[in-house]
Amino acid sequence: MSRVGRLPIAIPADVTVTVTPDNLVTVKGPKGELVKTMHKDISIAVENNEVIVTRHSEQKDHRALHGLTRALINNMVIGVKQGYQKTLDLVGVGYRAQLQGKKLVMNLGYSHPVEIEPIDGITFETPAATRVIVSGIDKEKVGFAAADIRKWRVPEPYKGKGIKYENEVIRRKEGKTGKK
């Protein structure tokens, strides 16, 4: 059995999980609703406030899908119950972020401001001029939106300037030593 896949997923009291025969999983909770189609070779059952994920055979790809499916459903349950968020820090002289309506506008040293529209289900917050919080109920979309913001200025290894995740450690390099 898969170490991850064999564990049942506990369903909180205010969350409902429904599974159709064609493996369409719907998770509803206080923060919203998520729908995802899972692979047909994995069986998903809801019993006694738990979701149980089983596989039909011991093929290598079925073993891999077993843990993946369980993790995806667990992420959906956590998302509709608590939600997900990623925090980004802007490090650099003049690097700033602000909201204009729902749109995120950042000054990152380019000749123009960078404007990013949030994708469906994602919200941006700027508690400080150099901090951006990306939040939503879908873990995949939150990570995608945060990576989309970060790609505009990936942290460089010499001074550490750029957009980094909150607890990310930038591996630093030593500069040139020069002639003596």
Curated annotation (Swiss-Prot):
SUPFAM superfamilies linked to this entry:
Ribosomal protein L6
> Which keywords does the record carry?
Ribonucleoprotein, Ribosomal protein, RNA-binding, rRNA-binding
Give a yes or no for keyword Plastid in this entry.
no
Gene Ontology cellular-component terms for this entry are:
cytosolic large ribosomal subunit
Q: Which biological process annotations from GO are given for this protein? A: cytoplasmic translation
The protein's job, in short, is: This protein binds to the 23S rRNA, and is important in its secondary structure. It is located near the subunit interface in the base of the L7/L12 stalk, and near the tRNA binding site of the peptidyltransferase center.
Subunit notes for this chain?
Part of the 50S ribosomal subunit.
Q: What is this protein called?
A: Large ribosomal subunit protein uL6
Task: Look up and give the organism this protein is from.
Answer: Clostridium beijerinckii (strain ATCC 51743 / NCIMB 8052) (Clostridium acetobutylicum)
